Curated annotation (Swiss-Prot):
Main location: mitochondrion
Species of origin: Candida albicans (strain SC5314 / ATCC MYA-2876) (Yeast)
Name the record gives this protein: Genetic interactor of prohibitins 3, mitochondrial
UniProt region (Disordered), positions on chain: 52-71
Keywords: Mitochondrion, Transit peptide
PANTHER family found in the cross-reference section: GENETIC INTERACTOR OF PROHIBITINS 3, MITOCHONDRIAL
Similarity-based family: Belongs to the TRAFAC class YlqF/YawG GTPase family. GEP3 subfamily.
Domain (CP-type G): residue spans on this chain: 171-374
Subcellular locations according to the entry: Mitochondrion
InterPro entries xrefs: G_CP_dom, Mito_lipid_metab_GTPase, P-loop_NTPase
Gene (name only): GEP3
């Protein structure tokens, strides 16, 4: 049975790649080059130049010990010489690797790639392929190994380490990514539930019609309880309607899954076309999703084998695994994940080139580097280590932190809410009160006003009791203080009536609910680090909870919330605001200054009835008039 299974998988794999090459010659070339690429990030491997991209070491090598390296190299040469003098059967017996794929020794011509950094010379790849054969599995470059194993508590961009500087984490633009993909290859656009709808780049429709793109929302475990089928179906219906009405994407081209929890993986396998290229924003969860598909296939195989190893028990479809089987399964998953599939990391720009992933010998996918429109995206990560990035980008669970029953804090009368020191939300200063639900991993802290923030940041050191409220370290606090009124971007929050979500890209959202009677039209202001982006949107919880229509006061059924998507904005961009040069004048500037900037941005005449000012009455009828998507 074992040999027959191996044979069938081999035949399926060969046929699959054959048909792939017939449809997309460029895809076939990516497959050929996969043998000499880093399995984690996709870059071309080389073992001659440690200071250049793609450098790797075989297990046991140590760069710091040149003598040992020389001896190892000499031993490898002798080992190679011995192997060459053996016939094939003796060679296989010596290396004890009968199932290792036989590699072709011919050189493969390079193809255009996303590697916009120092090119790797052709002769640096001479030994890569043979070494992979001897090692028995794919190799990872030194940069990827260092990120995964050696950068937990230090800044991820270390200028003193050649393989951990910004040039080793390139983040291309959308156009660059698409230039490496065959024009007729299927596209699967992945976006995160953590910051929906910020992960959807409208420019994609300039290159492909919406009917030819498949959209997958991942990280849905932070929005929808896994066991709540009603919530899943309700939100899926909303998402399909949203994508259809906003972008004309067919409803059947939209799917919801979770790579982290391997949720809906079997259905996703059938949803994604064969030989698809998986695209999306950097850090949206593409690689995790692809890896989960790969693991899901092998988990099925392992479960089947575990059940078959019980000859004394009656086999049936209802047979279940025992506790010891699950423990063994967990170990198999951990071991398999560390050696197979694309690498996953919270660091933007981790994937550097196309990574072919064979799921089961039939379906093959291509993990593609993430893109971005934010040129300052990497700036904030200069100040953070791997653990901090993992924490803040993990996302928080909506049902736990964002529901009506969740814990909330109260902000009132001009207080400033610090978002772990990388953002400051200034609330209206007159008779106002808001409930705040934090659906992020940011540590929030209330200050009396901006002057209080300045007084803290002016000190040589942040008080120890407050250090946890600032995500950057103490040595960078003075720089941050100087940036608050200059380097930090100032945004006006568009007027809103009722509850909203303030969404921060890659981070999550903060639910803001006004309480009491509205007594002021003063606008909220957000100071945000330029590496971050934000929008406001209608509360996402409205589209997850029960779809049962409510009764209006006259007894008639209200329209369902999904029916208004084409008529009202679901979200709004924030209004860029000019920052005055004098910090004190900024704090004391009258609300009318923000009113004027809002009207100018929306091209509203100051003398018109619709102009935003203290006299305007905001209510249900005009609450979206000042939103702009």
């Amino acid at each position: 049975m074992f040999s027959r299974s191996i044979l069938l998988r081999s035949v399926r794999k060969s046929l699959g790649r054959y048909y792939s090459s017939q449809a997309h010659p460029q895809t076939y070339i990516y497959n050929l080059l996969s043998d000499t690429k880093c399995r984690s990030c996709g870059i071309q491997l080389q073992d001659k130049f440690p200071d250049k991209p793609g450098y790797y070491r075989l297990p046991g090598q140590n760069d710091s010990n040149t003598d040992k390296k020389a001896k190892t190299s000499e031993l490898n040469k002798k080992y190679e010489k011995i192997l060459q003098n053996l016939d094939i059967s003796d060679r296989n017996l010596l290396i004890n690797n009968f199932s290792a794929p036989k590699q072709d020794d011919e050189k493969v011509a390079s193809v255009p790639s996303l590697q916009q950094i120092t090119p790797v010379e052709a002769d640096t790849r001479d030994t890569t392929k043979d070494q992979q054969t001897h090692s028995g599995h794919s190799l990872s470059c030194k940069r990827c190994n260092d990120v995964i194993y050696n950068s937990k508590t230090r800044s991820i961009y270390d200028p003193n380490r050649d393989n951990l500087n910004k040039s080793e984490f390139p983040i291309p633009k959308l156009q660059q990514v698409l230039s490496t993909i065959p024009v007729d290859a299927p596209l699967v656009y992945v976006f995160s539930a953590n910051d929906f709808p910020m992960g959807i780049n409208k420019d994609i429709f300039q290159y492909r019609p919406p009917q030819q793109i498949y959209f997958v929302m991942t990280k849905s475990d932070i929005l929808i309880p896994k066991t709540n089928v009603a919530f899943y179906n309700n939100f899926k219906k909303f998402l399909q309607n949203y994508m259809f009405k906003k972008f004309n994407v067919p409803r059947e081209n939209v799917f919801i899954a979770s790579g982290k929890d391997r949720w809906k993986m079997t259905d996703l396998y059938h949803f994604i076309p064969n030989y698809s290229y998986i695209i999306g924003d950097t850090n949206c969860g593409k690689s995790t999703l692809v890896k989960s598909l790969l693991i899901n296939h092998h988990v099925k195989h392992w479960k089947y084998e575990a059940l078959q190893q019980r000859p004394d028990e009656k086999q049936s479809s209802s047979a279940s695994l025992k506790n010891k089987d699950f423990k063994k399964l967990d170990r198999l998953i951990d071991s398999f994940s560390s050696k197979n599939g694309p690498g996953t990391s919270h660091i933007p720009g981790f994937t550097r080139d196309v990574v072919p992933v064979d799921i089961d010998g039939i379906k093959e996918l291509f993990d593609v580097p993430g893109f971005t429109t934010n040129e300052n995206l990497q700036d904030i990560f200069d100040k953070l280590n791997h653990k901090q990035i993992a924490r803040i980008t993990k996302g928080a669970n909506t049902s736990k932190y964002g529901s009506l029953k969740s814990k909330f804090d109260t902000v009132k009368n001009g207080q400033v809410l610090s978002l772990n020191g990388v953002g400051y939300l200034q609330f209206p200063g007159q008779d106002s009160m808001y409930q705040i639900r934090n659906v992020t991993k940011f540590a929030l802290h209330k200050f009396k006003n901006l002057e209080k923030v300045d007084s803290i940041l002016q000190r040589n050191e942040i008080p120890k009791s407050m250090s946890s409220h600032f995500i950057v370290n103490r040595q960078q606090q003075q720089q941050q203080r100087n940036e608050l009124r200059g380097y930090y971007k100032r945004y006006i929050i568009p007027p809103f009536y009722g509850t909203i979500d303030l969404v921060i890209k890659d981070i999550g959202y903060i639910n803001i609910k006004p309480t009491g009677k509205k007594l002021t039209n003063e606008l909220m202001v957000l100071y945000l680090h330029p590496s971050l982006e934000a929008i406001i949107r209608q509360p996402i919880l409205n589209y997850i909870d029960s779809p049962t229509p409510k009764k209006s006061p006259d007894g008639t059924n209200r329209k369902t919330i999904t029916s208004d998507i084409s008529k009202t904005p679901f979200y709004s961009r924030l209004i860029p605001s000019t920052v005055l040069s004098d910090p004190s004048s900024l704090v004391l500037s009258p609300p009318s200054s923000d009113y004027n900037q809002l009207n100018q941005y929306l091209q509203i005449d100051e003398s018109s009835e619709s102009a935003y000012n203290d006299l305007l009455e905001l209510d249900e009828t005009n609450k979206y008039d000042y939103w702009i998507e």
